[in-house]
Amino acid sequence: MTAAVIVQARLGSSRLFGKVLMPLDERTVLAHVLERCAAIPGADVVCCAVPDNEMDNPVAAEAERCGAKVFRGSEQDVLGRYAGAAKWLGAETVMRVTSDCPLIDPVVCGDVLALVAQDGADYACNNLPPSWPHGLDCEAMKATWLARAATEAARPSEREHVTPFIRNHPDCAKANLAGPGGRMIEHRWTLDTPADYDFLCEMFRRLPRGARGWAWRAALAVEIGRAHV
């Protein structure tokens, strides 16, 4: 069974243009995301789904430099872009990760992926309801459900946000990976604003290098320590 991690990426963020190519600890944000995705247990391939326009050529080039496969598709119809990438890859299971989450955790993602690839759910995530820091969000689904959504979803919001059709469908067997409890959802580890960028730059200056820096517990320890400095 081919399990593909597909990362959506583009330059045209309305709140922070070009964020995926911004430097973070001597590499781009996108490079961090793709490296982490390549370490997800059970993943066979990592693909970056990039809009098919000239402005996003640098994003595609950076993804290729990082060793990811690149699929080009519609900028606005993100669902169609994902479905096209999954078909192109011959994927049976698809994991969705966004490119503004440079602290995405491979182990958490692997646990979500296993809920579909091994346990038989049609769709799985770790935010139904939210219980992890914002920035560790991931989703996995059977490619057949992704293809069905691409064919049947009609609302603009369903095309833009990829999975609402699947998440809301009564026939879809869903599973959720619950967080460790406490006040985890109050932590924000994603990149949408200049303030987020400043925070993440400080986080990466303090995180240990290499695989030890990937675990969400390491990021949490750094954030808690920073708050008490």
Predicted regions and their residues:
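Short beta-strand-to-loop acidic/aromatic patch adjacent to the donor-nucleotide binding site
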Residues: 86, 91-101
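Active-site oxyanion/phosphate-handling segment shared across diverse enzymes
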Residues: 141-226
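Acidic metal-phosphate-binding loop of nucleotide-sugar-dependent transferases
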Residues: 75-76, 101-103
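A short, N-terminal amphipathic alpha-helix
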Residues: 29-46, 59-61, 65-66
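Conserved donor-nucleotide/metal-binding helix-loop-beta segment in metal-dependent transferases, i.e.
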Residues: 105-131
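N-terminal nucleotide-binding beta1-loop-alpha1 segment
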Residues: 1-16
